[in-house]
C-alpha cells in the first residue's frame, strides 16, 4: 500500500514537472515569436561599441544616437528597449525614412565664426591705409612743421608745396587723422622715423616762417646792405624765436623776398592814385561792382563790339610797328636818356631796386661769392638763390648789336622767349630780361652806339 502510494506520488510529481516545463517552454517560445514579429520591420545589423566621429548632414538619418541610447539602456537594465518593446516605429520616423532619399536637403551655408572674424580684420586695414598712398612721410613732416610754425591750416595749404596737389579739406582731414586716429598716427610716425637725416634736414629747411620771425626780419633796414654776419648775429640774439633749422643764408633770402614785396618796417607802400587811374589789373578788378554786371546778351551789340575789337587790334599792331620810330623823337624832346646814360655808358640794365651800367663791351651776369667776382651781381636786386654764379654774358658786337649768352642752368627769358643754356639772343632797346623771377629792362645808349657804328663803317672800307 505504501509502495503503491509512493509510486503514484512520484508519477504525479513527474507529470506536474513535465507539464510546468512544457508551459515554460511554450511561454518562452511565445515570447520569442512575439519579439520576432515585433522586430520584423527593423533589419538586424552588426554594430560596434566604438564611437566613430564623422560629419553629419541634415538629410542623413542619424543612427549613431540610437545606438548610443541603446547601449546606455543595455548598461542600465541589461535589456534593449527597442527590441523588447513590441511597438512599431512612429509615423514621423517613417516619413523621415521615406522622404530622405527622394528630396535631399542641401547643407546650410553657415559661415564659420573664424571666417567672419577674418573678414572683419581684413576690412580695417583698408580703411586705415586708404590715404597712405598719396600722403608720403615727407608730406606728413612738412605738414607738422608748418602747422607748428603758423597754427593756420589755410596758410599751410597756400604756402607749403607737397608731393601731390592736396585740397584744403584733404589737408584738414590729414591733420585731424594725425591728431586723433591712433592707427594712422602710429603708422605715420613709424614712416617718418625711417626717413634719412639728410631728407629730414631738407624738409626742415622748407618750414614756413612764423609771424615772430618775420617781425624780427622786418626790423632790418631796407637801405642797409646786411651781410651773412648780420643775420647770424640775429640768430644768436633770438634763438627762441627762430626755428631750429634756420641758417643765416635762409634768413637773408627771406629778407630779400620781404624787401621785394615792401614788407619791411621802413618801407611804405605807394597808395592808389586819385581819380580814374589804376596801377594794375587786380586793383581795377577790385573796383568793379559785380552786382551791376548783367548776363543779358545782345547779338547786335556783340557784333559791333567784335568789329570794334578787330579795328582796335589792327591799330595797335600798326602803333607797335611805329613805336621804335616815335621813341627816338620822344627821348630827344623830353630828355629821358640824360639821367640814365653818360659818355661812357653803352647800355643800362635797370631793375626795381638797382641800376647796372654797362661800360665795357662785355660784362658777366650772375651771383657774386667770395671766390667768384662778376660784373653784375643780381643778388642786389632781390632773391638770387636760383641764379647761377655765372648766369650769362652780354656782348657788344662791332656793328652795334648787343647779344646775351646763357651760361647758367636756368633759362633766361628775353621778351617772354626762353634762352636755354648754351644759346644766345639779340638784345634790342627796351627788351625785358627775366632771370629767375627778377625782371630788368635793357636800355641802349643810342647816341653812343650810333658813333660806334659810324666808326665801324669808316674802318671797314679800308
UniProtKB/Swiss-Prot annotation:
FHA domain boundaries: 363-419
Phosphothreonine: residues bearing it: 103
Modified residues (N6-acetyllysine): 123, 130
Record InterPro entries: FHA_dom (IPR000253), MCRS1 (IPR037912), MCRS_N (IPR025999), SMAD_FHA_dom_sf (IPR008984)
N-acetylmethionine PTM sites in chain numbering: 1
Keywords of this entry: Acetylation, Centromere, Chromatin regulator, Chromosome, Coiled coil, Cytoplasm, Cytoskeleton, DNA damage, DNA recombination, DNA repair, Host-virus interaction, Kinetochore, Lysosome, Nucleus, Phosphoprotein, Transcription, Transcription regulation, Ubl conjugation
Cellular location(s): Nucleus; Nucleus, Nucleolus; Cytoplasm; Cytoplasm, Cytoskeleton, Microtubule organizing center, Centrosome
Record's comment on post-translational modification: Ubiquitinated by UBR5 when not assembled in the INO80 complex, leading to its degradation: UBR5 recognizes and binds a degron that is not accessible when MCRS1 is part of the INO80 complex. Phosphorylated by AURKA on Ser-35 and/or Ser-36 during mitosis which is required for kinetochore fiber assembly and mitotic progression but not for spindle localization or for chromosome-induced microtuble aster formation. Also phosphorylated by AURKA on Ser-85 and/or Ser-87. Phosphorylated by TTK/MPS1 which enhances recruitment of KIF2A to the minus end of spindle microtubules and facilitates precise chromosome segregation.
Top-level taxonomic group: Eukaryota
Compositionally skewed regions (Pro residues) per UniProt: 103-112
Tissue/organ expression: Detected in testis, and at lower levels in spleen, thymus, prostate, uterus, small intestine, colon and leukocytes.
GO molecular function: G-quadruplex RNA binding; poly(G) binding; poly(U) RNA binding; telomerase inhibitor activity
Ranges in a coiled coil: 301-335
Disordered: annotated segments: 1-130
Motif UBR5-degron: positions: 389-396
BP-aspect Gene Ontology terms: chromatin remodeling; DNA recombination; DNA repair; negative regulation of telomere maintenance via telomere lengthening; positive regulation of DNA repair; positive regulation of DNA-templated transcription; positive regulation of protein localization to nucleolus; positive regulation of telomere maintenance in response to DNA damage
Domain text: The N-terminal region is required for nuclear localization while the C-terminal region encompassing the FHA domain is required for centrosomal localization.
Subunit structure and binding partners: Component of the chromatin remodeling INO80 complex; specifically part of a complex module associated with the N-terminus of INO80. Component of some MLL1/MLL complex, at least composed of the core components KMT2A/MLL1, ASH2L, HCFC1, WDR5 and RBBP5, as well as the facultative components BACC1, CHD8, E2F6, HSP70, INO80C, KANSL1, LAS1L, MAX, MCRS1, MGA, KAT8/MOF, PELP1, PHF20, PRP31, RING2, RUVB1/TIP49A, RUVB2/TIP49B, SENP3, TAF1, TAF4, TAF6, TAF7, TAF9 and TEX10. Component of the NSL complex at least composed of MOF/KAT8, KANSL1, KANSL2, KANSL3, MCRS1, PHF20, OGT1/OGT, WDR5 and HCFC1. (Microbial infection) Interacts with Herpes simplex virus ICP22.
The protein's name in its UniProt record: Microspherule protein 1
Organism name: Homo sapiens (Human)
Gene symbol of the encoding locus: MCRS1
Amino acid at each position: 500500500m505504501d509502495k503503491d502510494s509512493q509510486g503514484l506520488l512520484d508519477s504525479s510529481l513527474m507529470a506536474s514537472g513535465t507539464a510546468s516545463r512544457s508551459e515554460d517552454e511554450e511561454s518562452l517560445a511565445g515570447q520569442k515569436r512575439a519579439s520576432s514579429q515585433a522586430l520584423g520591420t527593423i533589419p538586424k545589423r552588426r554594430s560596434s561599441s566604438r564611437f566613430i566621429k564623422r560629419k553629419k548632414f541634415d538629410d542623413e538619418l542619424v543612427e549613431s544616437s540610437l545606438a548610443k541610447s541603446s547601449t546606455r539602456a543595455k548598461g542600465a537594465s541589461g535589456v534593449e528597449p527597442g527590441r523588447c518593446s513590441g511597438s512599431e516605429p512612429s509615423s514621423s520616423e517613417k516619413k523621415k525614412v521615406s522622404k530622405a532619399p527622394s528630396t535631399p536637403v542641401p547643407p546650410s551655408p553657415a559661415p564659420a565664426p573664424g571666417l567672419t572674424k577674418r573678414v572683419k580684420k581684413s576690412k580695417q586695414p583698408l580703411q586705415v591705409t586708404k590715404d597712405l598712398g598719396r600722403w608720403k612721410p615727407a608730406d606728413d613732416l612738412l605738414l607738422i612743421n608748418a602747422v607748428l610754425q603758423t597754427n593756420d591750416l589755410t596758410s599751410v595749404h597756400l604756402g607749403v608745396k607737397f608731393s601731390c596737389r592736396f585740397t584744403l579739406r584733404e589737408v584738414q582731414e590729414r591733420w585731424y587723422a594725425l591728431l586723433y586716429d591712433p592707427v594712422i598716427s602710429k603708422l605715420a610716425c613709424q614712416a617718418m622715423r625711417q626717413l634719412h637725416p639728410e631728407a629730414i634736414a631738407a624738409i626742415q629747411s622748407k618750414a614756413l616762417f612764423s609771424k615772430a620771425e618775420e617781425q624780427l626780419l622786418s626790423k632790418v633796414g631796407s637801405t642797409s646792405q646786411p651781410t651773412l654776419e648780420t643775420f647770424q648775429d640775429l640768430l644768436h640774439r633770438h634763438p627762441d624765436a627762430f626755428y631750429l633749422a634756420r641758417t643765416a643764408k635762409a634768413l637773408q633770402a627771406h629778407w630779400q623776398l620781404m624787401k621785394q614785396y615792401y614788407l619791411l618796417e621802413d618801407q611804405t607802400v605807394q597808395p592808389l592814385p586819385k581819380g580814374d587811374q589804376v596801377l594794375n589789373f587786380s586793383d581795377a578788378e577790385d573796383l568793379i561792382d559785380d552786382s551791376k554786371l548783367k548776363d543779358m546778351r545782345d547779338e547786335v551789340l556783340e557784333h559791333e563790339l567784335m568789329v570794334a575789337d578787330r579795328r582796335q587790334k589792327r591799330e595797335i599792331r600798326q602803333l607797335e610797328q611805329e613805336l621804335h620810330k616815335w621813341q627816338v623823337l620822344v627821348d630827344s624832346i623830353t630828355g629821358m636818356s640824360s639821367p640814365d646814360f653818360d659818355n661812357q655808358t653803352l647800355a643800362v640794365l635797370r631793375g626795381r631796386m638797382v641800376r647796372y651800367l654797362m661800360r665795357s663791351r662785355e660784362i658777366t651776369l650772375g651771383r657774386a661769392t667770395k671766390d667768384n667776382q662778376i660784373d653784375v651781381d643780381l643778388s642786389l636786386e632781390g632773391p638770387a638763390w636760383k641764379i647761377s654764379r655765372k648766369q650769362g654774358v652780354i656782348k657788344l658786337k662791332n656793328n652795334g648789336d648787343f647779344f646775351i649768352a646763357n651760361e647758367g642752368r636756368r633759362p633766361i627769358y628775353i621778351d617772354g622767349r626762353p634762352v636755354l643754356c648754351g644759346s644766345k639772343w639779340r638784345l634790342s632797346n627796351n627788351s625785358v630780361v627775366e632771370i629767375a623771377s627778377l625782371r630788368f629792362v635793357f636800355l641802349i645808349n643810342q647816341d653812343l652806339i650810333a658813333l660806334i657804328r659810324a666808326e665801324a663803317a669808316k674802318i671797314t672800307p679800308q
